[in-house]
Amino acid sequence: MPVDTLSPGAPATPALPFRLRTKVPGYLLPRPADGGARKPSAVERLEADKAKYVKSLRVANTRQEPVQPPLVRQPLFSPGPRGPVLTPSRRVLPCSGRRPQLDLDILSSLINLCDSPVSPSEASRTPGRPEGSAHKVPPATPPRPPPSTVAVRRVDVRPLPASPARPYPSPGTTTTSSPGRPPGLQRSKSDLSERFSRAAADLERFFNFCGLDPEEARGLGVAHLARASSDIVSLAGPSAGPCSSEGGCSRRSSATVEERSLDRVPYGVSVIERNARVIKWLYGLRQARDPPTTEG
């Protein structure tokens, strides 16, 4: 039977059902052998029938382009670590097929070294080196101080703050305080020195305000100036010294805190009283400066 008279037969693979045909991608479906026309898609069919449901002529003449996904632009420089770029001069040469053969003498010496106990002289040798290089002594490094001395130096450089030791008072200078004296009447030396320094600062400030020369003030006498200006600084508070009599101490010890606060003199001087004291003080300075004239 001649070959030309043979007609093309049916495809070898049976036709797929509709259920499987919708799930299988189009490029896997069998194509017709005769190269028939492709079935138009729904978009193409709507585009062909646009004149039926579109009233505007301008819209009917336009063609809708298929929607394409946006292109994701990759950054020029990725934030992650990049491998080193090899220039033509730095390209890695392909390694040769032969690998360097291991020296049997070195291997045997290493095995013997592991089996035998290590001596101090052999411990200084570096494994993997020939015997000639083992005799080289490394340069001596300066000895480092032990960690204990370093810790001691650190303690010496930054000592902990220690409270100052108070000197013990001698038995001859100790004074017996009365047991009935309240703690409010005891004044420390620092409090008294602070009061004296404050009074001296106020006195110097008053001299500068009045325009008095400090040398002239020293020439007039410190005792006279201090006595004349004692009324300007402030009113004297309750006495900080020891009690004059035992009766006064007992009266103070029996008083309460409220009574002591009422007995205190209020701090502050009126403007009129202050001006009067200034005039009195300036008059005293004038009398001290001008010698008394004798009438004769």
From Swiss-Prot:
Keyword DNA damage: no
Biased composition range(s): Pro residues: 139-148, 161-170
InterPro entries found in the cross-reference section: FAM110 (IPR025740), FAM110_C (IPR025741), FAM110_N (IPR025739)
Pfam families linked: FAM110_C, FAM110_N
Disordered, as annotated region: 61-97, 117-192
Primary localization: cytoplasm
Source organism superkingdom: Eukaryota
Keywords for this protein: Cytoplasm, Cytoskeleton
Keyword Metal-binding: no
A GO term from the CC aspect: spindle pole
GO terms classed as biological process: mitotic spindle organization
Localization: Cytoplasm; Cytoplasm, Cytoskeleton, Microtubule organizing center, Centrosome; Cytoplasm, Cytoskeleton, Spindle pole
Family: Belongs to the FAM110 family.
The protein's assembly and partners: May interact with CSPP1.
Protein name from the UniProt record: Protein FAM110A
